[in-house]
Amino acid sequence: MATSGFKHLVVVKFKEDTKVDEILKGLENLVSQIDTVKSFEWGEDKESHDMLRQGFTHAFSMTFENKDGYVAFTSHPLHVEFSAAFTAVIDKIVLLDFPVAAVKSSVVATP
């Protein structure tokens, strides 16, 4: 099966008093400055039952052209600096990094 890029998926539960808006702005700023990030999406869970959510509230997804692009991102000085601040406000986290097996192309939002 052919792959279509490399994905970095992060699901988090922030600590109680975290200023999530500041973290989101920092993350958006970070990905805009590192060229190897080809796409970035994030969302806050609004629909899952608490029992199923297990406390996790936010998901972040980045796509890279390949694993080398991801490795360049993780070692970039801006990412290293941001990671320290991000880690400090995390209560729980799940990370998945994998080659993408694209079955259907992206959904285009309608106005």
Curated annotation (Swiss-Prot):
* A GO molecular-function annotation: metal ion binding
Cofactor(s) recorded in Swiss-Prot or TrEMBL:
Mg(2+)
**Which regions span the lipid bilayer?**
none
Q: Which UniProt keywords apply?
A: Magnesium, Metal-binding, Stress response
Q: Which SUPFAM superfamilies match?
A: Dimeric alpha+beta barrel
Which InterPro entries does the annotation name? Dabb, Dimeric_a/b-barrel, HS1/DABB1-like
Please indicate which superkingdom the organism of origin belongs to.
Eukaryota
Q: Using the record's annotation, list all stretches that form the Stress-response A/B barrel domain.
A: 6-98
Give the protein's biological function: Involved in stress response.
Description of how the protein assembles with itself and partners: Homodimer.
This one is known as Stress-response A/B barrel domain-containing protein At5g22580
